[in-house]
Design a protein with these regions (language model features):
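A compositional/biophysical signature of low hydrophobicity enriched in polar/charged and small residues
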Residues: 1-178
């Protein structure tokens, strides 16, 4: 498997992650459930922080993803703003973080130096707590999914293992509701 991110022209399904911010008076539960019921939505994950919902999308091609975003997300009542990240390559990680029950989960959006991209992916694949790695934005961003026994455990992974890595420029960590 290549570690250089590329958009596939193979006809294989393509994906995107959308971070959504809901308006102050929006019915969060209604937005969450109505989006989850849409064709092409593979997950709707409530998150804490700058954004309220992390939406995973899949479509047959990038054009259909873009159409979904334009037609369904922009017109969704209660969604104030969003940020889209197209999945260019995904590395599922096997092991304890990917298997079994965990009490805490998080997602992190990392700005990374593209020169060290391959080395970063290799380090993340070996890191305890990382359950999935997604490349986006031409290798300038990596989205990590983590699982652990507590939010503190996940924060410690970031403070002790991720933040000090050469090539990690900025981290935004979002705890998810289990």
């Amino acid at each position: 498997m290549s570690t250089q991110p590329e958009i596939s022209d193979s006809g294989a399904p393509v994906g995107a992650l959308l971070f959504l911010r809901c308006g102050k008076d929006a019915d969060f539960a209604e937005i969450h459930s109505s989006l989850l019921a849409q064709d092409g939505v593979t997950a709707s994950i409530p998150v804490f922080g700058e954004w309220n919902i992390l939406l995973r999308l899949a479509a047959k091609d990038r054009e259909n993803l873009q159409r979904f975003i334009e037609e369904r997300i922009r017109s969704c009542k209660g969604v104030e703003s969003f940020q889209a990240h197209y999945c260019e390559e995904t590395w599922p990680v096997s092991g304890a973080a990917a298997d079994g029950e965990h009490k805490a989960a998080a997602c992190a959006l990392l700005d990374v130096d593209t020169g060290g991209f391959t080395a970063l992916v290799a380090r993340f694949r070996a890191m305890a707590g990382v359950s999935e790695i997604i490349a986006s934005d031409g290798g300038k961003k990596i989205i990590l999914f983590l699982r652990g026994n507590s939010s503190r455990e996940i924060r410690n992974v970031f403070g002790d293992e991720v933040r000090p890595l050469a090539g990690v420029l900025r981290i935004k960590l979002f705890n998810t509701m289990n």
